[in-house]
Amino acid sequence: MPKSLPQLRQQLSDIEPSERTYEGIGPPEVDALLSLLDDEEEWLATRAVFALSCIDAENARQALVSAAESPRMEVRVAAAASANTLPTQVSDEILSRLLGDPQPAVRKFAIKSTSGRNSEAVRQRITEIAAADTDTRLRQVAQQQATSIAEP
């Protein structure tokens, strides 16, 4: 039986999140987690993203792709930060969108989530950001990430 929305709220409300925070959350909870992406509490919306990233189900992965298009910056940051834990194709789809996000914080987390397992197109985007992004700090982060990806 799926956890109710109040049960999920309670479970995700740990002051200091740990693995236990996401324990027992699975495919039956995806719809409730989707509703939490719009919660007025930003921290709860971001924890819903991280909970979705722990679920090995297609509907959870599609919810994460949708989260990457959220109007809420904190939800997009959480989607970017969780991209490195997802299957490569889903990670590529999320990172392709978020590496071009207008918010530097979102781009920073997308850069940091990119790895050698991502597609050539995503890795090439890191190289482009490292060379030409208008934000000096993001260029530096991208340069470090590009170097890290290139190392065996």
Give residue spans per PLM region.
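HEAT-repeat alpha-solenoid elements in large eukaryotic scaffold proteins
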Residues: 5-15
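Amphipathic alpha-helical scaffolding segments comprising HEAT/armadillo-like alpha-solenoid repeats
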Residues: 1-7, 25-38, 57-69, 88-100, ...
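Conserved hydrophobic register position within alpha-solenoid helical repeats
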Residues: 18-21, 48, 79, 110, ...
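Short inter-helical turns and helix N-cap capping residues of alpha-solenoid HEAT/ARM repeat scaffolds
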Residues: 40-41, 71-72, 102-103, 134-135
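Core register positions within helices of long alpha-helical scaffolds
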Residues: 21-24, 51, 82-85, 113, ...
